[in-house]
Amino acid sequence: MAERVVIGNATLYLGDCLEVMPTLAKVDAVITDPPYGINTKSDGLGKLSPWGDLINSAHWYAAWMREARARLQPTRGCMWTCLNWRSMVTFQKAACDIAWPIESLMVWDKEWIGPGGLRGLRPSYELVALFAHGDFGIADRGLPDVQRFKVGSHKPNGHPAEKPISLMDFCVRHSPGAVLDPFMGSGTTGVAAVRAGRSFVGVEMDQRWFDIACERISRAQAQGSLLQPEAPAPTQDGLFASVEAA
């Protein structure tokens, strides 16, 4: 049974997204940064192991992607999901398995060069896949598929996979309505949604990151309203079933 915390127009759940998502009402957009390489083995060099493990991982990706799509409004919605070149095969397999093709693949230029390995090129980019649902379309027809959002080695909130707020601002700005993040982490997507005046639903299964997300989103709510100088007091309960599935 998931713990639920309501902060203004944001509702946060501490639990497994595969259990929580079926209980949620419809949203307009899913914006998320799922774990890369889940349910795979490693060869000890930071690389995912052989093809069979990648394909097995696709079953888990397909499961949450299917639930995420089911949460979208039937007529119009989208999903932005972060990935990298190693997890690209897994995402592509999962997308094919659920018949939801990737609409666009955005290259995120980090404007920073990572440490990399001892033999290959040093990484300076990641990827963001855009999935369209219903009659969704990017309004700005001049928007290119390479975008620059600066990031460095410092993680302001401590999360090892933390994304810059500018990246999530971009995804929110080019998405409709209410936003769901089934892998909320430290709450960056939620902060971006709240700053844009959007309703937000987030799910996170790690207590540490959930608590940080609650704090960050509470601060964002306060900063976003001149009429409310104090952060909204969170309310919480242990019943996610109180939110009816649409």
Q: Which sequence ranges carry the predicted segments?
A:
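Generic detector of low-complexity/intrinsically disordered segments
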Residues: 26, 67, 228-229, 241
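Asp-based, Mg2+/Mn2+-dependent phosphohydrolase catalytic module
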Residues: 202-203, 222-227, 243-245
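Short, conserved SAM-binding/catalytic segment
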Residues: 5-7, 214-227
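Core catalytic lobe of class I
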Residues: 3-203, 208-211, 246
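Short, basic, helix/turn surface patches
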Residues: 129-137, 227-236
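Intrinsically disordered, low-complexity and often Lys/Arg-enriched segments
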Residues: 1, 239-246
